[in-house]
């Protein structure tokens, strides 16, 4: 009897045969249950690896060869098990409309595979795998941040079985098409500041198609003893260069733990849930969605009814200089803070009070001295779920020298201007804005929304120039429909106007459509 070389090695043969029996039993018992789509793969890759095929010549290191075949076999089984289990799990939850990403469990230890398990142990392993998938899914549910221009929860998650680390990739492809008529906006987004006041033959109609708002994001979650849950997030779009260049742009890049956020994120002054959903990438002109590099701390208490946050953020100053003043590098961060009260079963309604204080430095060429101006702003914002189908959004802001915190005025040069009555002096400009909108959910897949927004720059000792921005108005109405949980289409109408200090006025109309697919 030639049992893998003979020569008294029957014991080794028995051990190898005994090790092989559970795998054959598992494959025959559970193949149809776990791997209905992979039977051909088993027949081609697994069956030829029975112990009879291991009969080789005596000069081959049989033990190493057996271990190599076992490792190869284990790898295939583990991959098929992960793919089948996560696919079945996704199908069950997707039918119920729940968040159900495809979770791939990562393991490099042989004891974690099903090869060494009997039928009962294999059932226990399957239960543990499902628990690991549920824990990873729960991590992404609890750390998801909804709101204006925020990404959806990821569809693909890679996680360790001990739930210490998980990693996900995702994004969406978005195509926007728009047509301006009876006046245009000199911007791919509907920025009322950029509406030409004195039109010409070239400012009557305009066609646009844009995919630069498509998004890619990466998110990693680590559960630690010392720092608790650590979240690393990065996302990017293609708005980094001139219009139509599709240059990649880093939007956010931060790490958060124990209430701290370190890196680049949406400014703390912004209430992400206070703005409606729009096809227009800019959104209401009185909103304040801008990015900043920051150190932020947030804390929720009273069963998440109350929350506050405070931050130090890199300043962005945009002023108007004359011959007596020059730019100067900034020396003090902006300090935004907020306090929020939330209610509802999921704390899905809230009101928030926010404030920001900033110091803006510039150089006085006439005196040769450096000087600074104090800027400040306050805001009231929130979202309220009035009834099951109806939700309201609003924010109102007032301040001096706070153009980074009012979208229509960002980069406008209106943080400060020379005093019209005394060119040797410079002054911060008072400004305010507000927006209100409503969303009606007609069905779980279909909603309509509409709203109004306005921004105003007040005069201070008169005005600096006739063409200085005075007021902008933004009106919108749209409809969104989700064809599938990952694919949605939308249509939108926008009207906007701009008025200068001279009371000259221009207006524009735009129709937008959008197709977006998330992955």
Give short role names for the model-derived ranges.
Residues 165, 205-214, 247-251, 256, ...:
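Residues that define the transmembrane beta-barrel architecture of outer-membrane proteins
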Residues 23-25, 29-92:
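Bacterial Sec-dependent N-terminal signal peptides
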Residues 229-240, 310-314, 354-359, 447-460, ...:
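Transmembrane beta-strand segments that form the barrel wall of outer-membrane beta-barrel proteins
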Residues 183-188, 243-250, 273-280, 319-327, ...:
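Outer-membrane beta-barrel translocator domains and adjoining extracellular loop/strand segments
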Residues 481-483, 507-519:
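Outer-membrane beta-barrel "beta-signal"
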Residues 87-181:
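N-terminal periplasmic/intermembrane-space "pro-region" immediately following the signal or transit peptide
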Residues 346-462, 469:
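Detector for outer-membrane/organellar transmembrane beta-barrel domains
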């Amino acid at each position: 009897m030639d049992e893998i070389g003979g020569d008294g090695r029957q014991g080794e043969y028995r051990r190898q045969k005994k090790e092989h029996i559970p795998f054959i039993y598992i494959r025959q018992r559970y193949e149809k249950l776990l791997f209905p789509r992979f039977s051909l793969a088993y027949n081609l890759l697994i069956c030829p690896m029975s112990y009879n095929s291991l009969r080789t010549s005596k000069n081959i290191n049989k033990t190493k060869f057996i271990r190599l075949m076992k490792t190869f076999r284990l790898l295939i089984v583990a991959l098929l098990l992960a793919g089948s289990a996560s696919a079945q799990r996704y199908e069950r939850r997707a039918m119920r409309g729940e968040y159900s990403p495809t979770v791939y469990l990562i393991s490099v230890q042989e004891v974690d595979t099903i090869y060494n398990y009997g039928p009962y142990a294999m059932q226990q392993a399957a239960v543990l795998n499902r628990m690991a998938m549920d824990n990873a899914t729960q991590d992404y549910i609890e750390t998801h941040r909804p709101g204006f221009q925020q990404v959806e929860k990821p569809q693909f998650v890679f996680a360790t079985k001990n739930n210490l680390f998980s990693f996900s990739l995702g994004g969406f492809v978005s195509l926007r098409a728009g047509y301006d008529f009876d006046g245009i906006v000199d911007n791919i987004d509907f920025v009322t500041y950029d509406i030409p006041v004195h039109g010409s033959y070239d400012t009557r109609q305009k066609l646009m198609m844009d995919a630069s708002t498509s998004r890619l994001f990466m998110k990693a979650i680590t559960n630690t003893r010392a720092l608790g849950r650590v979240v690393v997030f990065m996302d990017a779009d293609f708005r980094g260069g001139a219009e139509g260049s599709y240059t990649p742009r880093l939007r956010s890049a931060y790490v958060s733990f124990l209430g701290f956020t370190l890196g680049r994120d949406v400014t703390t002054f912004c209430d992400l849930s206070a703005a409606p959903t729009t096809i227009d990438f800019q959104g209401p002109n009185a909103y304040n969605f801008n990015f900043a590099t920051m150190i932020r701390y947030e804390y929720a208490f009273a069963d998440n009814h109350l929350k506050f946050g405070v931050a130090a953020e890199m300043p962005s100053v945009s002023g108007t200089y004359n011959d007596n003043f020059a730019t100067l590098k900034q020396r003090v961060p902006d300090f935004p803070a907020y306090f929020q009260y939330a209610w509802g079963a999921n704390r899905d309604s809230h009101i928030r009070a926010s404030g920001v204080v900033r110091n803006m430095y510039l150089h006085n060429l006439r005196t040769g001295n450096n000087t600074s101006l104090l800027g400040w702003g306050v805001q009231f914002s929130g979202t309220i779920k009035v009834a099951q189908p109806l939700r309201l959004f609003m924010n109102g802001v007032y301040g001096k020298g706070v153009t980074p915190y009012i979208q229509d005025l960002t980069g406008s040069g209106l943080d400060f201007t020379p005093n019209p009555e005394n060119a040797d002096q410079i002054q911060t400009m008072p400004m305010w804005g507000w927006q209100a909108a409503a969303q009606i959910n007609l069905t779980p897949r279909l909603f309509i929304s509409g709203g109004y927004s306005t921004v105003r720059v007040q005069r201070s000792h008169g005005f600096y120039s006739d063409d200085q921005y005075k007021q902008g108005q933004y009106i919108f109405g749209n409809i969104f429909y989700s064809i599938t949980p990952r694919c949605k289409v939308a249509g939108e109408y926008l009207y906007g106007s701009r008025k200068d200090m001279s009371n000259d006025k221009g207006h524009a109309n735009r129709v937008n459509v959008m197709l977006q697919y998330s992955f």
